[in-house]
């Protein structure tokens, strides 16, 4: 299965295409605080071109939908929805926090330490706030939350 995925929820813009037949990943990542709307579509085009596939070869579209600023997540979700409709492909979405927890869960499984299975993902929400969510492995134990750290 060939999966086209992208993220616009943080201070970077990224797109990747997983080529299911070879498990190869073609990706593009650019740090940026703003400008996601201008870079996302060209970035998606770049990864598809570099992969040697055509858009019709994509089997699924994946996108993150926050938490983050309204504009950041709206850009990614709108692009994902447009591509999914235009290509008649299924669309899957995940929170950025759950994607990060998934990556950590893979590392924890290697360690096999039961105490290490609880994962707290915390990211800068700006304005002196933090987005956070608690997981046990890949399972969410809480909803995403916005917290104000105390001094």
Regions found by a protein language model. Give the residues of each.
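Surface "functional belts" at beta-alpha junctions
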Residues: 23, 35, 90-151
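Stable alpha-helical structural segments in soluble proteins, enriched in small hydrophobic residues
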Residues: 47-51, 86, 104
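Buried hydrophobic packing segments
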Residues: 44, 79-83, 100-104
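N-terminal beta-alpha supersecondary unit
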Residues: 1-65
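Glycine-rich nucleotide phosphate-binding loop and flanking beta-alpha elements
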Residues: 12, 69, 127-129
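Short, charge-rich binding segments
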Residues: 53, 85, 111-112
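DPxDG-like acidic metal-binding loop motif
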Residues: 62-96
